[in-house]
């Protein structure tokens, strides 16, 4: 893992903390403060130190700052503009996402990311800088750069070593631009050949193969400092409808889901996945009222309580047709948060982004959401940022030739 992070914060930990966790060697140094991000050189350290830093930071955060951290926002156009600047500087959003509509040439893409970081430089919490870089038809690279094949290619090889090396390559590629989070790999099982949205984005129709290859790609990224977001829980592989356009319905029982769709996600949880993205899909056998991304029965009862996931839950983009055909973005975001989500992904429309922030504030003021519930999610988010030592350091230039040499070596 690379970089400094959460700059400007002095983290205090009293001597008794070290005694309680039984770290006698640390106790001898108890007069010293725990290392800040910039001082740390090792990825692995006591979770108690991460928790202590986050707890200290949260003591000084306002409710507005906490709610800002719950949002990952997108933007219009290919250049940095006033709306994104306002969201970063005034609302202190947790992160940004770049989509295809934002991608230009390599230097332009780098400039956009650097300007986002500059806007956040005076703030104490670094941004998630996120992207969908799966390979195949879901790639956010400039058109001049070589792109990885779709997941289906790796499924045909069955080569877990190649899958891990692909995750490593993705980490190197994304670090080169300054990203720190990738919405990949896809853990959906390709169980419906007529699926209009997943298809070759899935590794296989075999859930165990999806799990094996997906975990290899995930670890290739996380071992090299990129946060991996596995998706689309509880499974998007058997849909007949594209959730970007309308709401898919899957008529499967929980027993049927356990036999296929949930297998890769169960493995991901066992392998300590950091973030799981929840899909916008209706599973009437599980919840006949809300789609999965808004469902307490699916996010809290199934994912959290039954499957014991303790990491960060993020929604799929809340501006997709599956949501906006039936809800406003703010009301859907509030319901998703009540259901158990931590991060709310709103990939576009400045008005919706600001209205969602205001709706969350109003929900707390009305008592619909407690501040304790806000703190729960913010702690998960900040611990993740802390663990990966995120930073807003600028990238001076991109060596495209070096990246392409790595690509050629990977797929030679």
Regions found by a protein language model. Name each.
Residues 2, 6, 23-89, 306, ...:
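Preference for extracellular/luminal or secreted protein segments
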Residues 12-22:
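Bacterial N-terminal signal peptides
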Residues 39-44, 73-78, 95-104, 151-164, ...:
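Second-shell loop/turn segments in exported
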Residues 62, 104-121, 125, 137-139, ...:
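Second-shell residues forming the walls of enzyme active-site clefts
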Residues 68-75, 94-98, 127-133, 181-185, ...:
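Hydrophobic faces of well-ordered beta-strands that scaffold small-molecule active sites
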Residues 86-99, 169-181:
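Catalytic domains of carbohydrate-active enzymes, especially glycoside hydrolases
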Residues 151-179, 186-214, 218:
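A substrate-binding/cap region within the structured catalytic cores of diverse enzymes
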């Amino acid at each position: 893992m690379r970089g400094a992070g959460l700059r400007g914060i002095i983290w205090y930990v009293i001597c008794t903390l070290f005694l309680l966790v039984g770290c006698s060697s640390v106790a001898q140094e108890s007069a010293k403060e725990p290392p800040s991000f910039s001082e740390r050189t090792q990825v692995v350290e006591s979770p108690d130190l991460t928790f202590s830093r986050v707890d200290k930071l949260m003591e000084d955060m306002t409710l507005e700052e906490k709610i800002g951290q719950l949002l990952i926002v997108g933007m219009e156009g290919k250049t940095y503009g006033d709306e994104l600047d306002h969201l970063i500087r005034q609302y202190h959003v947790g992160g940004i996402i770049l989509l295809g509509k934002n991608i230009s040439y390599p230097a332009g893409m780098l400039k956009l990311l650097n300007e986002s970081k500059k806007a956040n430089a005076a703030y104490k919490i670094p941004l998630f800088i996120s992207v969908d870089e799966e390979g195949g038809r879901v790639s956010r690279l400039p058109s001049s750069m070589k792109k990885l094949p779709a997941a289906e290619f790796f499924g045909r090889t069955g080569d877990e070593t190649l899958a891990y090396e692909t995750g490593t390559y993705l980490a190197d590629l994304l670090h080169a631009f300054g990203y720190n989070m990738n919405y990949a790999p896809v853990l959906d099982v390709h169980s419906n050949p007529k699926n209009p949205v997943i298809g070759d984005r899935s590794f296989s129709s075999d859930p165990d193969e999806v799990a094996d290859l997906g975990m290899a790609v995930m670890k290739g990224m996380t071992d090299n400092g990129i946060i991996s977001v596995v998706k689309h829980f509880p499974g998007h592989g058997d849909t007949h409808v594209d959730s970007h356009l309308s709401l898919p319905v899957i008529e499967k029982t929980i027993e049927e889901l356990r036999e296929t769709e949930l297998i890769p996600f169960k493995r991901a949880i066992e392998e300590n996945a950091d973030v799981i993205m929840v899909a916008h899909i209706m599973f009437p056998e599980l919840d006949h009222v809300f789609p999965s991304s808004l469902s307490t029965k699916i996010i809290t009862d199934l994912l959290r309580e039954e499957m014991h996931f303790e990491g960060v839950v993020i929604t799929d983009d809340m501006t997709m047709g599956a949501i906006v055909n039936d809800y406003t973005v703010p009301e859907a975001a509030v319901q998703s948060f009540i259901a158990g989500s931590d991060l709310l992904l709103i990939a576009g429309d400045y008005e919706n982004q600001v209205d969602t922030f205001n709706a969350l504030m109003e929900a707390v003021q009305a008592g619909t959401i407690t501040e304790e519930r806000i703190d729960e999610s913010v702690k998960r988010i900040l611990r993740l940022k802390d663990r990966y030592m995120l930073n807003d350091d600028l990238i001076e230039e991109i060596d495209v030739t070096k990246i392409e040499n790595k690509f050629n070596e990977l797929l030679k």
